[in-house]
Each structure stands twice: as structure tokens, then as C-alpha cells.
Amino acid sequence: MTSTLPYLTSPPATHPSNSDHKKLRSACDSCHQCKVKCSGGSPCFRCTSKGLNCRYGYQNRAGKPKGSKNRKTLEREHQLRMEWLTSQLRDANGGLGNLNIDLSDPTTLLPSPFFQSTRWKQGHMLPQSSVQPTPANQCIKSTEHESECLPTPQGLDTWTMDLGPIAQTPRESTSESLEAFTTPISFTGGGETYLRQLSDPTTPISFGFPSPHARLDGTGDPCACVQTQAVNISTLHQLTCRDRSDRFDLAMKSITSTLETCEKFVVCEACDKSVASILLTLSAIELIFTLFEQLTMNNRRLSPPEEEQRLIPCSLGDYKVTKEESQAIRNVLVKMTLSKGKQALNALQNLVNGSVDFLDESGPCEASQHDSNNANEPMLSGLSVTDRNYMTQCISRKNAALEVLMAAVAV
């Protein structure tokens, strides 16, 4: 016996096409839209009681496809991948950190198996018959004794090809504090002893870098001016690479030490006044001006509360200096340091323009190299016209910037 109630009858059977495999919803469209439970049937109880049109639509699966990953899963996989990469780079940097690199010996830059004689000369060389007579090959033929040891790009080991990611990673500092690295070395006390340790190849802190263009004294060490300036440049790099210079004392100490080294370099008779040594001094002055700009900007703007807590306390005996007085003292110190910088620039300008002929034993080689590159360019006092003009322009630009900085500091 079939029931006469319309809501107890089953919905008509539908035969969807085999192409889409869609199924009907268990709730009618009206109940689905109102988000209420549907009794089923055609029509359902709710549509019958309210006189609605009861229709059943196909299911609409709008979710992600099967096998897709959500954001949390992707972030977790990325984090695991980055942790693995970091561990690999840390192991690689730890292995490379204990190496004693000597630039004068190119074999130290590649692993020892890479320089096996049979493998180097037989396995990694192109046959001479395959070399085309191009202009580049003609240049290579002029230095056959050097090109015989050069490998082909296809023959390079995986070790040498994978150095790119390691070289591009930022250098991790051993300490977040600026006090961890060496402060500038003065010319008093044990500065020269420490500098001799820096140049000693037997010590673990030395990498055996050759120092050309530096005049050696009786013990075989370069002049203390050049060595101290190199240490100052390393310290200035540490200070200028930070986001902001929050240590006024370290900045002033580095600037003062570098300016004193510049003045001693100009008047020192043992120093070699070559192009390389003068460019080293100009590089130090370039880094000094970066600190000058930071100090000038910090003096002109108001310090936020978190920076005021890091200010170094200042006192004169039992008298404690206030914040305004401490700022005035800073301005005076910056102004005096800018004046010292102007004196150092003037002394360096006089050295470039009116220096005598400072040429060491390597001078004839440098002069012949200049003559081969610029045959018609005269050499004046050990410096070419191009070198002298370039240095003069650099010093002039720094003098102009110095005038602006001195006008910006109010005393």
C-alpha cells in the first residue's frame, strides 16, 4: 500500500550523466538556503507546510582539490627546509673558519684532491685540436705556462661549484656587543707588539695576506702607520654596518684614532707614500664621514625614551651632568673632531699636491706598468696625473661635506 502523503514519497530517481558524476543534495534548495534540517522527500515537510517549491540541486564541492596543502603545512615545510639549510651552512662555515688561507699560494683556495697532477692535467683539459683560433684563445696562447693549469667549466668539481650559497650568506658575528671586537690601536703602549702579532704567519689570527706596496723595516714588518690604519678600517666597518650608531664613545674613539693615524702617516718618513697607501687612508676617511653623518643626525634630532636609557652617564667630579648639558658636551666634541678632520684633509691634500718622489723598490715596476697602460701620461712625484686628479677631487668633496657638517652642529 502506497502512502498518500506527499512528503513521504521518495524523490524521483535521476540518472546523471557519466561525464560529471554529480550527486543531489540530501536537503532541498529551500532548506539548504535557510540552513535548516530537511526531512527529505519530494516535496519535503517544510516546503509542503509553507507551500514552497521543493527542488533538489547538485552538490557543489568548492573546497580545495585532493592532495592540496594548507598554509600551516606549507609554512612548516618551509621552516624545516630553512633549518636544514642553516645547519648545512653552519657546518660549512665552521669547517672553513679554521683554514689558514694564503693568497700567495692559489692551491689553498681549492681542496687538495682537486690538485692531483694526473687529474688536473689530463682529466680537466680540452684537447688542443678542439680549441678554435679565436682572439680570446690567442690571448691565452700568450701565457701558455699559466693556461695549462686552468680547468674547463665542465670539469670543475661539485665542491667548487657549490661555493655560491656559502659566499652569499651573511657573516655571523660571534657577539652582539660592539665590545667583542678590537678597538682602535693607538701608537702608545703595546700597539706595535699587537700589530707584529697580526702580521706573524705562525699565529692563528693571521691569514698570511701579503702586503704589497708597504715599505718594510729591518724586522720585515710593514710600517706601523699602515698596519694601524688597516685595523682602524676593520673597526670602522663594524661600526658603520650597524643600523644606527648607539655607542657614541666607540664612534669617537675610532674616529680620533683614525685621524691620528692619518696625521702620522703624512709626516712619517718610514711610510711608503705609494698609491695603495694613500688610497688606504682615503678609504678610512670615507668611513669616518659615514660616522660623522650619523653623529650629526643624532645630535640634531630628539632622542626617543628608549635611546635616552642607553646614554652614557657623564659627571664632573661630584657634579652630575644633566641631559641638556651632556648633549652640549657631545656637540663640542663632535665640532672639535670635525676640525681635526679638516686638518687631516688639508695635510693629505698637501701630500698629494706637493709630495716628493716616494718610490720604493717596487716603484720601477709600477712605473713601467703605468707607462704600458698610459704611454703619454707623465708621472709626477710618484703619482700619475690621473691618480693625483682623482685624489684631489675626493679630498675636495670631503672638504665641502665637512663644511656642511660643521654648520649643522650647533655649539
UniProtKB/Swiss-Prot annotation:
GO cellular component: nucleus
GO biological-process terms attached to the record: positive regulation of transcription by RNA polymerase II
UniProt GO molecular function: DNA-binding transcription factor activity, RNA polymerase II-specific; sequence-specific DNA binding; zinc ion binding
Pfam families assigned to the protein according to its UniProt record, in alphabetical order: Zn_clus
Gene3D superfamilies (alphabetical): Zn(2)-C6 fungal-type DNA-binding domain (4.10.240.10)
Residues of the DNA-binding region: 28-54
Induction data: The expression of the hexadehydro-astechrome cluster is induced by glucose. Expression is positively regulated by the global regulator for secondary metabolite gene expression laeA and is strongly induced in conidia during neutrophil exposure.
UniProt function note: Transcription factor; part of the gene cluster that mediates the biosynthesis of hexadehydro-astechrome (HAS), a tryptophan-derived iron(III)-complex that acts as a virulence factor in infected mice. Positively regulates the expression of the HAS biosynthetic genes.
Protein name listed in UniProt: C6 finger domain transcription factor hasA
